[in-house]
Amino acid sequence: MLLLISGSGITYFAFERFSMTHVFEMFTVSFLIWNSVRFYKNRNNTSGFLIPLSLLIAFLVRMSNFYVFLIPLIIKNLVKTRHRKKFSLLRNYYFIGSSIISTYFYTILSNKIYGKIIFNPQEVYGTNLSVDDVISNENSLLGLFIDIFRTSFKIFFGNEFGIFWISPIIFVGLFLILSDFKNLRKPFNLLLLMCFAQNFAIVYIWKSTAASYGFRYLYSLVPLCVLIYFQYKDKKINKYLLNYALIMSIFSNLSILFFETTEKTQLSTT
């Protein structure tokens, strides 16, 4: 697990871009997953109380990450499938009480910072661009598909921060889900695809070097992709893809090391 996480690009943000939110995104999403697993597996009331607080912090760190609200449902379906346990989060009094407290704190913080309660991140980021706007700018359906293909190719295999090279666990997580045709319609897989779809839509809308060609906005998916990796590792499916994740994680660590110690790179230490 340490190799997969270190090879996800975390060292780049932890040691060179620590002022950005991405390391905090990974922590909050991981914390949310951990609490969700503890609750649904052991009915841990402390975790039931911490789940709404985890959601609050994760949403405040990056308000465009709406998918975090799907994570408790993803874990619920995972635990239900693997351990045959059914615990209702919505009926847990600790969860209900914490949800009320978290909602109250969010309204206070939002009013203090923005002067009103905000749920639309576009109001924070100062943009009104949407997927519909991007699609309507294309002259034809063929042009739209070509543009999506070009963007996807750059996200996966771009020379700068292509996730195939720099964050193999994200690449593997997505393709493990897509290649599992037998279970593609199951709630666990569908919810995970929704998480990927939301982040990829954001990347498609804002195609720029400032977004590291999508890597920055996909990075918060790393904890979920690690979860996917171990879910399929137990099933012994796609061994070559799983081995690729381990090998390329080593390459990712080395590539970031060379990137940060080369004189002509943007964040060179010399």
Can you say where each PLM-predicted feature lies in the sequence?
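Hydrophobic/aromatic-rich transmembrane helices and adjacent perimembrane loops
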Residues: 21-28, 61, 67, 166-171, ...
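Perimembrane helix-loop-helix junctions
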Residues: 67-100, 172-184, 227
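Membrane-interface catalytic loops of GT-C/OST-like multi-pass glycosylation enzymes that act
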Residues: 13-23, 63, 111-116, 158-163, ...
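Membrane-interface alpha helices of multi-pass inner-membrane proteins
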Residues: 2, 47-62, 69-74, 97-101, ...
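Transmembrane alpha-helix segments characteristic
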Residues: 1-5, 51-55, 100, 182-206
